[in-house]
């Protein structure tokens, strides 16, 4: 039964390293990996492609229900995301997509539509799920829960370096402002607000290297 499959949830705000840590931990454990944020971004992309008005809840819910999302791992280990059979990986990573996804994620009907789809990722031998409400809403019965945090300034700096490395010109101040705004939206929304589960291990990654965070998370599961 799916309920017997172990789940490790890793929640936290944007830019704390959830995705990087989750992928490494999943690979080390040999478990499946769920990037819940990619699902919301995929719906955001599909809605944008279909010119859906973000104020039209009915249309957005239909879009969330109809959008086909597939994850394909390349030979180099990179995960590509296909939205309605089109590789949308690069579009999903754009800042504008993240902003739209955050707006869409605040709609309760959309979250309800995607909830069951996320829960279907729970398969043997185990699942590492990263997002914002994995441990509080999607998998409240998860055996292992982690909540990652980091100061907004540090998260903005990490994102700034990522974008500069890709040749994308961006203002640090604008990035910091957007991260703070997204934090506020995620924490204050009426449905599934961003917060740690009562039984989650809290890890502040502000001054930590990725391998240090990975070690703490793995210790939670293996010790």
From Swiss-Prot:
Location of the protein in the cell: Cytoplasm
Q: Where does ATP bind?
A: 12-20
Annotated CDD domains: CMPK (cd02020)
Listed under catalytic activity are:
CMP + ATP = CDP + ADP; dCMP + ATP = dCDP + ADP
Record's keyword annotation contains Nucleotide-binding:
yes
Q: Which GO terms describe its molecular function?
A: ATP binding; CMP kinase activity; dCMP kinase activity
* Keywords, sorted A to Z: ATP-binding, Cytoplasm, Kinase, Nucleotide-binding, Transferase
Any one GO biological process: pyrimidine nucleotide metabolic process
One GO cellular component this record assigns the protein to is: cytoplasm
Entry EC no(s): 2.7.4.25
Family indicated by similarity: Belongs to the cytidylate kinase family. Type 1 subfamily.
HAMAP family per record: Cytidyl_kinase_type1
Record-given protein name: Cytidylate kinase
Q: Which organism is it from?
A: Xylella fastidiosa (strain Temecula1 / ATCC 700964)
This chain is encoded by the gene named cmk
């Amino acid at each position: 039964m799916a309920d017997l499959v172990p789940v490790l949830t890793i929640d936290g705000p944007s830019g704390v390293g959830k995705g990087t840590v989750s992928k490494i931990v999943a690979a080390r454990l040999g478990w499946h990996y769920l990037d819940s944020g990619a699902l919301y971004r995929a719906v955001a992309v599909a809605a944008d492609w279909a010119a859906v008005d973000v104020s039209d809840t009915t249309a957005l819910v239909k879009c969330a229900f109809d959008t086909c999302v597939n994850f394909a791992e390349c030979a180099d280990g990179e995960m590509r995301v296909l939205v309605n059979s089109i590789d949308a990986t690069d579009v999903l990573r754009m800042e504008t997509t993240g902003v739209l996804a955050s707006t869409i994620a605040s709609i309760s009907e959309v979250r309800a539509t995607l909830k069951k789809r996320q829960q279907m990722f729970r398969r043997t031998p185990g699942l590492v799920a990263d997002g914002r409400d994995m441990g509080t809403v999607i998998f409240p019965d998860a055996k292992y829960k982690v909540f990652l945090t980091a100061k907004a300034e540090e998260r903005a700096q990490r994102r700034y370096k990522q974008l500069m490395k890709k040749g994308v010109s961006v203002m640090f101040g604008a990035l910091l402002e957007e991260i703070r705004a997204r934090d506020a939206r995620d924490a204050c929304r009426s449905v599934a607000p961003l917060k740690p589960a009562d039984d989650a291990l809290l890890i502040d990654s502000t001054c930590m290297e990725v391998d240090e965070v990975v070690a703490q998370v793995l210790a939670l599961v293996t010790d």
